[in-house]
Structure formats: C-alpha cells, structure tokens
C-alpha cells in the first residue's frame, strides 16, 4: 500500500502499529568500478544493504571508494561521501573519474556527527550510494557508540534502497553488514619505459570476501589494480 494511503489507516489502529518498509530488491547491484571485483560480487555491491570494506594502510581502501563513486556518478546517479577525517581531495577524485556535481561531500567534525549525517542522508531516499569513510577506525568509546547504530543504519539503507558502504581500517559492523571485503596491499608497480627510468604507478592490492549474506559466491578473491 502506498505510504500516503497507509498513514490515515494507521491513525485508526492500536498504538504500536507503525508504517513499515519493503526491502530493496536483493538482485540489484551497484557496480564497484573494478571489473575483476564485480565478477566476484556478481555485479557489484548490493543495493539497499550495508556493506563494509576494511584494510590497513596502502590496502586500496581509498582507491576502491573513488572507483565506486566514479562508477555510480557515471551512471547519472547521485552519491554522498561522509568524510570523517576530511581526507578526500576533489582534484584527485575528478582525475579518478568522479563527477563531482553528483557527489555530496560531507565533512563532519567527529564520529557522532558523522553518524547523524548518515541517518539524515539515508532518510532522504534520493541517493544511490552513501560512503561512510572512517579512515583509521574508531576510538573504543566511539566504537561502543556505533555498535548500536549499525542495525539502525542497515534498516534505513534497506528502507531507502540505498547502498551504504563503510570504509575503515578494521571490521566494525560485524553481522549487520550484508557484504564484507578485506583489502590487502600487494607489491608496488614500477612500469618500465624505453626512454626513462621506472616510475612508481601505485600498489596492487587484493580484495577478499569474508562475508556475503546473500547468495553463494564461486570465487572469493579479486585482484585490484591501482
């Protein structure tokens, strides 16, 4: 039943009966921007779900976030980046293919404000993607505060059919994440050119699926180029 028709009906029902939401289609995927990863994930990150990407320094977290934002905006969809440590560089983002006009860049002052920003963004139901970048993770106090927020954020993402992706150094959302990827840095790439010395081109990394709630994956690892 459409919400506009359901609300008048709810007013006549006993207290405690609330307006619910249907979950987003579980077969819908949001491309990650990496062909090798999308083949493993059968199309990309699940829409309407909370997904988690974690890894140490130089593991490719930022690169994957930029690829995801670039792939989303290239499809003429709108995304939001909640940048908890104010590390996003718009010039690098543009060079990575992100259409900045389709990205809402939010720079909260602390973790508490970042959480509130995510709740507001998911409540708009106008976005295809929300990336919550917690950079180097959370303090023990903040982690305890967020532990009760993950089920709420997962529910909001499902209600709005928004892909919510958490980026952090360590795993935080646990079983509330429908998809969890572990990133590990690999070897440095030094392509050789005929007329000059080798130039550093980045660090290759690998993504491993450590949790996938929906469906059985035949492959669980993917190589990610810089």
Predicted regions: what they are:
Residues 154-226:
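Phosphate-binding/switch region of NTP-binding enzymes
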Residues 51-53, 80-82, 104-106, 165, ...:
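Hydrophobic/aromatic beta-strand patches that form the interior of the parallel beta-sheet core
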Residues 144-152:
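Charged helix-capping and loop-helix junction motifs
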Residues 1-81, 95, 215, 226:
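Detector for small/aliphatic-rich hydrophobic stretches
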Residues 71, 92, 156:
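Hydrophobic/aromatic ligand-binding patch that stacks against planar heteroaromatic rings
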Residues 56, 67, 75-141:
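Conserved inter-motif catalytic segment of the P-loop NTP-binding fold
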């Amino acid at each position: 039943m459409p919400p506009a028709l359901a609300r008048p009906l709810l007013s006549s029902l006993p207290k405690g009966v609330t307006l619910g939401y249907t979950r987003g289609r579980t077969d819908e995927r949001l491309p990650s921007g990496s062909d090798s990863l999308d083949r493993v994930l059968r199309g990309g990150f699940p829409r309407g779900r909370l997904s988690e990407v974690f890894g140490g320094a130089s593991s490719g977290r930022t690169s994957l976030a930029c690829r995801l934002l670039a792939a989303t905006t290239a499809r003429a969809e709108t995304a939001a980046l909640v940048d908890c440590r104010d590390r996003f560089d718009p010039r690098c983002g543009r060079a990575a293919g992100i259409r900045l006009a389709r990205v809402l860049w939010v720079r909260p002052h602390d973790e508490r404000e970042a959480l509130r920003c995510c709740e507001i963004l998911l409540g708009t139901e106008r976005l295809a993607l929300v990336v919550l970048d917690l950079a180097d993770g959370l303090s023990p106090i903040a982690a305890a505060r967020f532990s009760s927020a993950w089920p709420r954020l997962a529910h909001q993402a499902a209600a709005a059919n928004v892909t919510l992706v958490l980026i952090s150094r360590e795993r935080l959302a646990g079983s509330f994440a429908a998809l969890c990827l572990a990133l590990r840095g690999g070897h440095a790439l030094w392509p050789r050119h005929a007329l000059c010395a080798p130039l550093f081109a980045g660090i290759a990394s690998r993504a491993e699926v450590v949790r996938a709630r929906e469906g059985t994956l035949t492959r669980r690892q993917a190589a990610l180029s810089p």
